[in-house]
UniProtKB/Swiss-Prot annotation:
<dbReference type="Pfam" id="PF01556">
    <property type="entry name" value="DnaJ_C"/>
</dbReference>
<protein>
    <recommendedName>
        <fullName>Chaperone protein DnaJ</fullName>
    </recommendedName>
</protein>
<keyword id="KW-0346">Stress response</keyword>
<dbReference type="InterPro" id="IPR001305">
    <property type="entry name" value="HSP_DnaJ_Cys-rich_dom"/>
</dbReference>
<feature type="repeat" description="CXXCXGXG motif">
    <location>
        <begin position="169"/>
        <end position="176"/>
    </location>
</feature>
<keyword id="KW-0863">Zinc-finger</keyword>
<dbReference type="Pfam" id="PF00684">
    <property type="entry name" value="DnaJ_CXXCXGXG"/>
</dbReference>
<feature type="domain" description="J">
    <location>
        <begin position="5"/>
        <end position="69"/>
    </location>
</feature>
<dbReference type="InterPro" id="IPR036410">
    <property type="entry name" value="HSP_DnaJ_Cys-rich_dom_sf"/>
</dbReference>
<feature type="binding site">
    <location>
        <position position="155"/>
    </location>
    <ligand>
        <name>Zn(2+) 1</name>
    </ligand>
</feature>
<comment type="similarity">
    <text>Belongs to the DnaJ family.</text>
</comment>
<feature type="binding site">
    <location>
        <position position="212"/>
    </location>
    <ligand>
        <name>Zn(2+) 1</name>
    </ligand>
</feature>
<feature type="repeat" description="CXXCXGXG motif">
    <location>
        <begin position="209"/>
        <end position="216"/>
    </location>
</feature>
<comment type="subunit">
    <text>Homodimer.</text>
</comment>
<feature type="binding site">
    <location>
        <position position="169"/>
    </location>
    <ligand>
        <name>Zn(2+) 2</name>
    </ligand>
</feature>
<dbReference type="GO" id="GO:0006260">
    <property type="term" value="P:DNA replication"/>
</dbReference>
<keyword id="KW-0963">Cytoplasm</keyword>
């Protein structure tokens, strides 16, 4: 069957940035992960999504894919369609060289060990939080709500009504695995497979927990407080350990990953990593007279004495009023104010008379040099 284009799988354009690809992957992973999506095709869809992300988030692989398409990973650089038999053959040879080769395949496709034997960490969760400039500057506490896979509050994840309802599977003797003999030419090999009686759990539950119907887990809506410290920057992450989904096999919870983004602002802009740039409107009269004005900033109102005859597009620098240079530290960048002198469109009669008097008496004439 022809493989689907990796960009189409993730729903991004061929010019998408790494950040856009990561965001698309996280969105699809939340939608199709088998722990959260019980539809029959969720597993295959997730495999397809992971495969696409693995290539497009690797600069070298993406370059090869853009040039050669799926052919870049076929043949000698790809994996055999008969991979299972190939791995079975070498995994039973007992050679240290082949055994390490088999481990490489296990890293990609998982080993034959049962979930019951391996205690793995729960699925991590990624959440995007968009901050205003003021929230980014001073830090903020946010409450987020998530549907998280959680251990049942009655059976504590066992899935049984009581401990006495749990017994060891007699078919696999609690390992979750059974040995299957396989003939390959003149050779006969043994292969581990998931126990078909306990479905790899290694245990049999007589009476299932009524609260979770024997699953041991369920999705629960949770409120989580996230402290976003001052000094953080857009596109940085905050990790809350073990605040993600519960493990499906008695491991620790996954993590909650917070991706920080900055809301668009018509007023403020980050420059030089630590400085804040803003454009500020100033009256033409204040500019001419060099008056003291009040500048409204994220820190509140600041009094500032204008230099006489300041012009538009000149800059005012207010030290130590920019972003904090590092998390929870007090050193800051600067606030850079770009001056925009505003002239009124309409004047009252008195204003017009006074300005006409000044015009008649002034010797000021701006220079315009058009000589090349």
């Amino acid at each position: 069957m022809k493989k689907k284009d990796y960009y189409e799988v993730l729903g991004v354009s061929k010019t998408a940035s790494e950040q856009e690809i990561r965001q698309a992957y996280r969105k699809l992973a939340k939608q199709y992960h088998p722990d959260l999506n019980k539809s029959p095709d969720a597993h295959d869809k997730m495999v397809e999504i992971n495969e696409a992300a693995d290539v497009l988030l690797d600069k070298d692989k993406r370059k090869q894919y853009d040039q050669f398409g799926h052919n870049a990973f076929d043949g000698s650089s790809g994996f055999s369609s008969n991979f299972a038999d190939f791995e079975d053959l070498f995994s039973n040879m007992g050679s240290s060289g082949f055994s390490s080769f088999t481990n490489i395949f296990s890293d990609f496709f998982g080993s034959n060990k049962s979930d019951y034997q391996r205690s793995t960490k729960g699925q991590s969760v990624s959440v995007d939080i968009y901050l205003t400039f003021k929230e980014l500057l001073f830090g903020v506490d946010k409450i987020i709500e998530l549907d998280l896979l959680t251990n049942c509050s009655v059976c504590f994840g066992s899935g049984a009504e009581s401990n006495s309802d749990i017994s060891i599977c007699n078919n696999c003797h609690g390992t979750g695995e059974v040995l299957i003999q396989k003939n390959m030419g003149f050779f006969q090999f043994q292969q581990s497979a998931k126990c078909n009686v306990c479905n790899g759990a290694g245990k049999i539950i007589k009476n299932k927990c009524k609260n979770c119907k024997g699953k041991g887990k369920y999705l629960e809506r949770k409120k989580i407080e996230v402290n976003i410290p001052k000094g953080i920057r857009p596109n940085q992450q905050i990790k809350l350990s073990q605040k993600g989904h519960a493990s499906i096999n008695n491991g620790v919870n996954g993590d909650l990953i917070i991706d920080i983004y900055l809301k668009e602002s018509k007023v403020f802009e980050i420059v030089n990593n630590n400085d804040i740039l803003m454009t500020y409107n100033i009256s033409y009269l204040d500019a001419i007279l060099g008056n003291e004005i009040i500048i409204k900033t994220l820190d509140g109102d600041i009094k500032y004495k204008l230099p006489k005859s300041i012009n538009s597009n000149e800059f005012i620098i207010i030290n130590n009023k920019g972003l904090y240079k590092s998390i929870n530290k007090d050193k800051r960048g600067d606030l850079i104010i770009k001056v925009n002198i505003v002239v009124p469109k309409n004047l009252n009669k008195k204003e017009k008379e006074l300005i006409e008097q000044i015009y008649e008496q002034t010797s000021f004439n701006p220079e315009n040099n058009i000589d090349q």
